[in-house]
Amino acid sequence: MTSEAPRVKNKNPAPIQISAEQLLREAVERQDVAFVPPKINITDLEELQEFQGRKRKEFEDAIRRNRLAMGHWMRYGQWELDQKEFARARSVFERALDVDSTYIPLWLKYIECEMKNRNINHARNLFDRAVTQLPRVDKLWYKYVYMEEMLGNITGCRQVFERWLKWEPDENCWMSYIRMERRYHENERARGIYERFVVVHPEVTNWLRWARFEEECGNAANVRQVYLAAIDALGQEFLNERFFIAFAKFEIRQKEYERARTIFKYAIDFMPRSKSMELYKEYTHFEKQFGDHLGVESTVLDKRRLQYEKLLKDSPYDYDTWLDLLKLEESAGDINTIRETYEKAIAKVPEVVEKNAWRRYVYIWLNYCLFEEIDVKDVDRARKVYQEALKLIPHKKFTFAKLWLMYAMFELRQRKIDVARKTLGRALGMCPKPKLFRGYIEFEDAIKQFDRCRILYEKWILYDPEACAPWLGYAALETKLGDSDRARALYNLAVNQPILETPELVWKAYIDFEFEEMEYGKARSIYQQLLRTAPHVKVWISFANFEIAHLEDDDEEPPNEEVASPTAVVRARNVFENALAHLRQQGLKEERVVLLEAWKQFEAMHGTEDTRKHVSSLMPQVVKKRRRLEDGSFEEYLDYLFPDTATDQGDKMRKMLELSRKWKEEMAKKKLEA
């Protein structure tokens, strides 16, 4: 089949059979012209007032037709806000709340509008009304406390949390309150919340959270009191092996081995054996490490140490063995021995300057840094280890983003943000890798420095404009910040790039963005732009699904929520028809079959009997054909014979298939009669 459709001189219909071309031509000629709303130019105040009155009448009519459609109310209120008619906007939202005060998006939209216009007291009053009427809706409470915290009103934030806790919400609320107090280093308040928390939700997990909190605060006596209080409060019915294992491991970390042994023995006597298999395993492991037979255990450790040292003598650059030896020494707990082992391990610098040969070696450095920071709590020594590791790596050949990022996060934990920034900036200057860009951006995003995030995204795009990750990440950041125009501009720049690694991801994200913004016309334009550059059958099908998935303002209202709008169905059907015409013109048979199958499913859900028959009439017949190969042999293959194939050979093939089908039906009837 040629790439272009043959030019038909005689456009009159055939006396017997009507061609597909004639059907399409008549369909186009009879097609109604789409309504294009006139462009309005407002020149004076009187015209503006007349326009506003007309729009208000349209909104009021839409509300009268379906007063329960909250989308009309929200669009009405938003329009009034766009006109700077704040009193009218509030009136619209209040009327909507009178209709349905349980519709959460309406409350959020109302509050968001007040916050955007910096009417904080109005927003606070609305939150009070919302949580009073809907105290079981957690989203309203979360938004409320988030607003108060962002405003710096920590006292008000606590008051909101206390109001919320009176309703005894789920665990996430309590943990959010605790995390808020910990962010402001109010550990005593957090401790008081935990005391109330375990009364309302006395699960083992919550007691363990409290114990972990006390351990992080560095008060071992309080941790023990929490565990003992949990034993008294929960009793045998609710305690499990995980609780006792956590208690014992805490005592092990405190080097209180006799206490840990007592806990294990008590738990074994307390818990039934069927529910304490992991407890027995941990106790056995504990006794092997810290049991009474210290000589035996020491012999076992020495034996394993000798085995590792022998292996390292034969293969001094076997870094997996070094890691096993270091793990063994860390389990022994001798800090000086552990340091000596680390120094011996890092002295074995790989002889080959290749990244794969350095990977496991760098892990030794990372473990060394974590050991000094976490186990020994020697911050200065940990910093020195990080710096020595960075000096050693040949950055001109390769680098390890994980090391740079861990060092930056280490400095952040020490509250040296400038040093962390300089470290990451130095890393990007020496070796700009995507992982470093991503880590640096996450670092700035974590401390809410969004302008710096923008600068980093711009540098990333300049460095690698063909990569999709910086474009998508930048646009997602602007979307998160609520700047839709900047996000849209970024997506537009991305799709217009001459070369992209995976452009389909950018197109999909762009379309999803416009769909979430309810800018359906812009999303449609993006689909049309994509089809001009990549007219793939999947894009056509996605375009049709998009048309049926949304309801525009001028669309005909569906009879119920389960049925699509007739106007949307017509739009989607037009997309399928255009796609079929394009694929027919390009001579893409398999793609036409895929499209027709999707169209058939669409008509099965949204079409009528006539439209289903029409699509079925377009389905091809599968025929077997033979073709000659280069070596002179033949092979069979499947081909598609479409009803609109305008060739003599196709007509003969269809007639032959029709005769074959009739013969089979006659033979089947004869068998039944016999």
Swiss-Prot record:
* One example of a Gene Ontology biological process annotation: spliceosomal complex assembly
Q: What's the chief localization of this chain?
A: nucleus
Query: Which InterPro entries has this protein been placed in?
Result: HAT, HAT_Syf1-like_N, HAT_Syf1_CNRKL1_C, Syf1-like, TPR-like_helical_dom_sf
Sorted UniProt keywords: mRNA processing, mRNA splicing, Nucleus, Repeat, Spliceosome
HAT repeats span: 50-82, 84-116, 118-150, 152-183, 185-216, 218-253, 255-289, 299-331, 333-367, 377-413, 415-446, 448-480, 482-516, 518-549, 567-608, 610-643
* Statement: the UniProt record of this protein carries the keyword Ribosomal protein: no
Against SUPFAM superfamilies, the record matches this protein to: TPR-like (SSF48452)
SMART domains given in the database record? HAT (SM00386)
One term under GO cellular component: post-mRNA release spliceosomal complex
Q: Which Pfam families match?
A: HAT_Syf1_CNRKL1_C, HAT_Syf1_CNRKL1_N
Where, per UniProt, does this protein localize? Nucleus
* DNA-binding found in the keyword field: no
Instruction: Outline the subunit composition.
Output: Belongs to the 40S cdc5-associated complex (or cwf complex), a spliceosome sub-complex reminiscent of a late-stage spliceosome composed of the U2, U5 and U6 snRNAs and at least brr2, cdc5, cwf2/prp3, cwf3/syf1, cwf4/syf3, cwf5/ecm2, spp42/cwf6, cwf7/spf27, cwf8, cwf9, cwf10, cwf11, cwf12, prp45/cwf13, cwf14, cwf15, cwf16, cwf17, cwf18, cwf19, cwf20, cwf21, cwf22, cwf23, cwf24, cwf25, cwf26, cyp7/cwf27, cwf28, cwf29/ist3, lea1, msl1, prp5/cwf1, prp10, prp12/sap130, prp17, prp22, sap61, sap62, sap114, sap145, slu7, smb1, smd1, smd3, smf1, smg1 and syf2.
Per the entry, what this protein does is: Involved in pre-mRNA splicing and cell cycle progression. Required for the spliceosome assembly and initiation of the DNA replication.
Query: Family assignment?
Result: Belongs to the crooked-neck family.
The name on file for this protein is Pre-mRNA-splicing factor cwf4
Instruction: Provide the species name.
Output: Schizosaccharomyces pombe (strain 972 / ATCC 24843) (Fission yeast)
Question: What's the name of its gene?
Answer: cwf4
